[in-house]
Structure formats: structure tokens, C-alpha cells
Amino acid sequence: MRLRNKPWAADLIAENPDMILVSPENIASNWQSRFAKEQPIYIEVGSGKGQFITQMAQKYPDRNFIAVEIQESAIAVILQKQVELKLPNLQLLLGNGAALTTFFAENEVAGVYLNFSDPWPKTRHEKRRLTYKSFLAEYQQIMQPTGYLRFKTDNQGLFEYSLASLNAYGMVFDDISLDLHNSDLAEDNIQTEYEEKFSKRGQVIYRLEAHYK
């Protein structure tokens, strides 16, 4: 979902280079230098307004997190939160999730989160889905051998597509939930803004976790 333009976004981003990078060219393999401690790095591709990634950073201080978002207006909202929170284990990246291998080195990432990604329902837009094979190849290249991919959505069609796509790519499923909020995983689940809103309306949330062979 595209947010309304925020006239103040560009200035806020320019004022906080220690918290956010804009399509950097020389950051691959150097992300640890941007954090207070050298810890495993986890990224969320398509972070929206940032509720998930900021709460994850607060809950897991022994991990480093990077919010990857292509919309300036969206990442500016996350940056507002980070300016206030000043979490030492959170960095922001304004950039295209289709270019992750430009921003991250091989084996630099311990895990990838995809939360409520745009389903791009039309067949001609299949290549834009974040679980399309070209994206899976991007994640694989930057992920450590022990890393994982976690994906949540309320869109049944996208979930079924993603199961088929990951399976065709040769990934191994560690967990599949057809009703996350009524499963054993619900207690530790950190919700996105979107997830919170629609789960209250009774919308079923789907989740999977998988790794590369």
C-alpha cells in the first residue's frame, strides 16, 4: 500500500545519515560498522511503517536489524520512530528489494522477513512478487547457509503461490501455518500495523518459514 507523499521526508532522511542509507553503492560487507555491536543481521524487505522491525529490534537486542523499503514516505515514518527510539541495533535502507545483492555481500544476512507484501495478483506482474524466483535467488545469495526466510500474508492466493514458488526453487519448509493467530506461534508473533488491523476483523493470517538446501 503506497503512503501519501510526505513533504518533510527528504529533509528528515538527509538529517540522519547515521540511521539511514539511500541506495548505497559501497555498503556490502560493511553493514556491521553501522551498528553498536557486531551481531547477526536480519532484514525485512518492505517494512511499511516499521512497527514490526522496531519491535523486533527492541525484543531482540542481541540481533541487528535492517528495514529495507522502496517508498520514501514509508521509510520516513520508520525514521521518525528511530529518531525517537535511537535503537542501536536498527538501521534503515531506502532502496529496491530487487537489488539486495547490490547492498549486501554473500553470507552477510542471517534471515529475511517478508510481511504482507503486495500480492501483485495479475499474471503479468508475477515477477514483482517478493516470492518470485528471482527474489528467492537474491535472498539466497546474501543469506548465510543457516539462514531462514519467514513470510506472512493475509492473501490466500499469494500464500499458495509462494508455497509453490519456494518448493519449485528447492527450498525446505520448516513451518507452515494456515492460521497463525490460532497457532502455537501466536504468543511470540510480532504484528505489523496491517496485520493488527485485519486480524481484529477476523482475517486469517498465513505464515511460512523455509531455508535453502
Swiss-Prot record:
Q: What InterPro entries does the annotation carry?
A: SAM-dependent_MTases_sf (IPR029063), tRNA_(Gua-N-7)_MeTrfase_Trmb (IPR003358), tRNA_methyltr_TrmB_bact (IPR055361)
Q: Which residues bind substrate?
A: K122, D154, T192, E193, Y194, E195
Q: Which GO terms describe its cellular component?
A: tRNA methyltransferase complex
The reaction(s) this protein catalyses: guanosine(46) in tRNA + S-adenosyl-L-methionine = N(7)-methylguanosine(46) in tRNA + S-adenosyl-L-homocysteine
* Active site per the UniProt annotation: D118
Stretches the record annotates as Interaction with RNA: 124-129
Residues that bind S-adenosyl-L-methionine, according to the entry? E44, E69, N96, D118
Instruction: Give the E.C. number(s).
Output: 2.1.1.33
Class of the enzyme per the UniProt entry, highest EC level: transferase
Q: Is Transmembrane one of the keywords UniProt gives this record?
A: no
This protein's pathway reads: tRNA modification; N(7)-methylguanine-tRNA biosynthesis
The protein's GO terms of the molecular function aspect are:
tRNA (guanine(46)-N7)-methyltransferase activity
**Could you tell me the keywords of this UniProt record?**
Methyltransferase, S-adenosyl-L-methionine, Transferase, tRNA processing
Protein family: Belongs to the class I-like SAM-binding methyltransferase superfamily. TrmB family.
Q: What does this protein do?
A: Catalyzes the formation of N(7)-methylguanine at position 46 (m7G46) in tRNA.
Q: Which HAMAP family did the record assign?
A: tRNA_methyltr_TrmB
List the protein's name: tRNA (guanine-N(7)-)-methyltransferase
Species this chain originates from: Latilactobacillus sakei subsp. sakei (strain 23K)
Q: What phylogenetic lineage does the species belong to?
A: Bacteria, Bacillati, Bacillota, Bacilli, Lactobacillales
